[in-house]
Amino acid sequence: MIVGAGYFEDSHDQSLMAGSLIHDSNQAPASSENTSIDLQKFKVHPYSTEALSNTANLAEAARAINHLQHQLEIDLEQEVPPVETANWDPAICTIPDHIINHQFSEDPQNILVEQQIQQYDSALYPNGVYTPAPDLLNLMQCTMAPAFPATTSVFGDTTLNGTNYLDLNGELTGVAAVPDSGSGLMFASDSALQLGYHGTQSHLIKDICHSLPQNYGLFPSEDERDVIIGVGSGDLFQEIDDRQFDSVLECRRGKGEFGKGKGKANFATERERREQLNVKFRTLRMLFPNPTKNDRASIVGDAIEYIDELNRTVKELKILVEQKRHGNNRRKVLKLDQEAAADGESSSMRPVRDDQDNQLHGAIRSSWVQRRSKECHVDVRIVDDEVNIKLTEKKKANSLLHAAKVLDEFQLELIHVVGGIIGDHHIFMFNTKVSEGSAVYACAVAKKLLQAVDVQHQALDIFN
C-alpha cells in the first residue's frame, strides 16, 4: 500500500502498525493526531443492512465502481475527487507519516529509493500537484545473493569440457551451473545480474529456432540421439554411410535418404528373389508325371523321387541294350558253331562266348516306379524277367477286370494274384513274368494301369 511519497512494507516491525489496524477511533494512538493528510478531502458513504439488501443500490454501486476503474485506466494522473469525511475513521484508513518516515529511516536502501521517487515526482510534476505512486519495479536494483559461487562454465569446468553449450556466443551473462554429485547440475545466478528488462534481446535463441525446420523440436528424438557423439570434442553428428553432417537438418535428411534408399532396395531385391523362386518351383512341378501337392516341401520330395526313378530307368535301359546286343552276338556264335560242326572243325569262339555270358549274368535288370493319382496308387518293380505290381484304389466295381486287360496288352504271364480290402480301398498284388522277346518297362506298365483305372472311375461318375 503506497500513500503519498512513501511506501508500506509488511515485513517491518508489526508493532508500528497496531494503531492503524484498530477499528475504534478512541483506541488509536496519540501519534495519529499529528498526521499531515487532510482528512477533509475524503468521505466514505455510510452503508446499512437495508441499503445492501436493496437491488437498485447494489446495481448503482457496481456501475460506480466500473466507472471509477475505467477512469483510473484511462488517466492515472487524474486527481482524486474530494469526498465527504463525515464517517471517515482515520485509525482504519490512514497511515501516519511518522510510521512511514520511521520505516524509511531504518534501511539505507529505502532512503535511496525515496530519493529516487522524489526526483521522479519533481521531474514529472514541478508544480507539486498530487500524483500516483510510480512503478517501483523499474527503479529498484534487486541484489540477489547467489546460492553457489558464480562460475563461468556450464556442465562442469571449462578445462574438462572445453565448450559451453548454453553460452555459445558469450551472450548469456550472470548464469552459471554448478556440478552437484547427488542430482547432476544446479544453476546459480551471479550478483551482478539485473532484473530489469533489456531492450536488446540476444540473438542466440532466435538463431537456434530459425535453424530448425518447422514443427521440429529443439531436442532430437531417441533415434536421432543415437547419432550424437563427441560432445566434449565438438563433433555433433556421427558419420552415416561414410557421410558427415554439420547440422540437425542435414543429419535428419541424410538419415531419411539413407534408410529409404536401402530399405526400398532390400525390399525390392527380396521380393524379386521370392518371385523367381516361385516361378522355378512351378516349372519344376510341371516336369513331374504325377505331382502330389503345391507346397515347396512336397515339390522337393517329388523331385527326389523322380530323380531316383530316372536313375533306375537309365540303368535298366543300359542292361536291356547289353542283353539285346549279347543276344544278337550269341545267335551269330551259335550259327557259326553249327556250320563248323557240320564241317568237322572245332570252334575257337566258345571261350569268348563263355566270358560274355558270365559278364551278362552278373548284371541283373532291376527297376522301380511309383505313380499316384486321385483315386489310385500303382507300384511296379522289375527284377530280371519278373514283374511285381501292387495296385491300390478306392472301392469300385470291375477293378480287377481292367487290370487284367492291361497285363494282357504287355504279354505278361500271370503267375500269382492276391487281393484284399482295407477300409475303403481295394488292394491287388500281381506276380508276372516277362515273355521272351518282349520289351517291358516299369514306367509304361504303371502309366497304363493308372489310365485304365481313372477312365473307369470317370465313366462310373458320369453314369451315377
Curated annotation (Swiss-Prot):
Q: Which residues form the bHLH domain?
A: 261-310
Q: Which PROSITE patterns would you find in this protein's record?
A: BHLH
A Pfam family of the record is HLH
> Single GO molecular-function term?
protein dimerization activity
Which cellular component appears as one GO term in the record? nucleus
| Sequence segments annotated as region (Basic motif) | 261-274
- Annotated region Disordered: the residues are 338-357
Q: SUPFAM superfamilies from the entry?
A: HLH, helix-loop-helix DNA-binding domain
Per UniProt, subcellular location reads as: Nucleus
- Knockout or disruption consequences: Male sterility due to failure of tapetum programmed cell death (PCD) and degeneration required for pollen maturation. Male sterility due to delayed tapetal PCD and aborted pollen development.
**Name the record gives this protein:** Transcription factor EAT1
- Classification of source organism: Eukaryota, Viridiplantae, Streptophyta, Embryophyta, Tracheophyta
Gene name of this polypeptide: EAT1
